[in-house]
Amino acid sequence: NLLARAKQPDKPDELKAFCLTGMSRKERLNAIVQSMDKFYYQYGGIQLVVIDGIADLVKSANDEAESVAVIDELYRLAGIYNTCILCVLHFVPNGLKLRGHLGSELQRKAATILSIEKDEEPTQSVVKALKVRDGSPLDVPLMLFAWDKEAGMHVYKGEKPREEKEKRKERELVNVA
């Protein structure tokens, strides 16, 4: 549970979490818009919005017009409320390409794209920056995490050694060449 992970006894009043799966796709986006407006004025700002499953806001990730409309609306809301909107979108199976027109549009507008992948060490996963608008993704540390049975959750395991970072730079350059 979120509170246990954050080592907090109680949920702060400002933290809101909603399950929108019982709504139609159009109602989901409207609920996000309305709640952002409400909570912006109620709390004097919004620190972060997380949409876990942005593909659930559209009928088809391959519908260009619908994808552009949803991303434009989220981009507009981020600007109006001066906040970060973090969107989760899965890659196509066995690839590093985001799904459909939705993925393409999200890549175009995103300030940062992070990827969570299996590490060479099979019990760990690694978080990699694929895009950083004001910098190089190669300058962002590779963060490791793994399932901890005792804690009952994934835990941070540190950064990959500097040598790994240098190997990544070399691999990226070879792939570009």
Model-found features: residue ranges?
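Phosphate-binding/switch region of NTP-binding enzymes
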Residues: 48, 56, 65-155
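Generic low-polarity alpha-helical segments
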Residues: 1-3, 17, 106, 172-177
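Alpha-helix initiation/capping motif
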Residues: 21-25, 99, 166-169
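Conserved alpha/beta core segments of nucleic-acid transaction machinery
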Residues: 31, 134-177
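Conserved inter-motif catalytic segment of the P-loop NTP-binding fold
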Residues: 1-62, 149-150, 160-161
